[in-house]
Amino acid sequence: MKIHRNRPLLLLVTAFILFSAFRADKPFITIFTIGDSTMGNKKLDGGNPERGWGMMLPGFFSEDIRVDNHAANGRSSKSFITEGRWEKVISQVKKGDYVFIQFGHNDEKTDSARHTDPGTTFDDNLRRFVNETRAKGGIPVLFNSIVRRNFVQPKDASIAKDARQTPGEQELPKEGSVLFDTHGAYLDSPRNVAKEMGVVFIDMNKITHDLVQGLGSVESKKLYMFVEPGKIPAFPKGREDNTHLNIYGARTIAGLTVDAIAGQIPELGKYVRHYDYVVAQDGTGDFFTVQEAINAVPDFRKNVRTTILVRKGTYKEKIIIPESKINISLIGEDGAVLTNDDFANKKNVFGENMELRDRQAATSMLRISMQRTSLLKIRQGR
């Protein structure tokens, strides 16, 4: 787009206020998520790339939806209740909210604090979640477990135990080309309870099985926590983990899941959004900085616009847009601010008298304020 002298700030901010003004007085719909480590939020210390798919959900919904993720590492349907976690969630549920329920990985464990049996105690816990959610006017949705990356037959015991190991710690079993199930009847309980109680059921095991099987034993490692030694401070010795997801895996699976949700719950589906990249300071996106997202845009993508959602926060960055990065849209959440102190007292920081074209200089540097905004398009070329 052309940026004219003395007008860009006014035009941009005016447009953004119009977009965001409709959000102010509308009540949020909250999606509460309960489950285990494959769904949960993760600490970011040391560059930890592990993510639960539920952690990535905010980047797939409009700002009408608030995601409150209570899924926690190591929890089963039983321990989630006995530790008081469920009471904390259900006390906050209001009419029209959703509760996404996914357990199974740890219900399979043998220790008495977590173990439940499919068909009896596991099903009873799921029924409790459903009944108590409905009693508060909420809408329960049942999910079964995501697939473990198990290309070994018979199933390898270490995989079934969700083992995490460092590379070379022990010899791995030879993998084949067929993905084998490790969950057994624990996959059926959510399906059966959903049918019995008239609840929406999302078959996440099938969604993830099809994804992982389609990628194969080698490419599917890109979804999971396979970390080379010496690459990430959080795991100096590396990591080999066939259960837990990395950033790419969690974003990919969350995207497939929201599409399945939209297909079964149109009322929620109207809030679903897909972006090529999400930038978020809290780890709920692909990147922490806007510059990283711009760098990831494919070069000379002329016929397709690349969309980048910038989630709430203040991003102090000097944005450099190479001439090869064209047709980019930055979409800022309400409260997203992109700024750089180096430019604060300089004129022409919005590129006045500049039209960004393919043949322009190699880079263009912009300071962009997205306060109270929700849409910004940066376009190079036509």
Q: Residue spans of the language-model regions?
A:
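Alpha-helical cap/lid subdomain in secreted, periplasmic
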Residues: K2-I3, K26, R85-I247, R251, ...
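Serine-esterase "nucleophile elbow" of acetyl-processing enzymes
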Residues: R23-A71, E87-V99
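Bacterial N-terminal signal peptides that target proteins for export
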Residues: M1-L10
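Bacterial Sec-dependent signal peptides at the C-terminal "C-region" and cleavage site
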Residues: R7-P8, F16-F28
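Short, solvent-exposed loop/turn elements at domain surfaces
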Residues: M39-L44, S77-S79, D286-F288
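Right-handed parallel beta-helix/beta-spiral solenoid domain characteristic of secreted/periplasmic
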Residues: Q281-G283, F288, R301, I326-R382
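Active-site-proximal beta-strand/loop segments in catalytic clefts of secreted hydrolases
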Residues: I34-S37, N69-R75, I101-N106, F143-V147, ...
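Acidic Gly/Asp/Thr-rich repetitive segments characteristic of extracellular carbohydrate-active
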Residues: Y277-L309
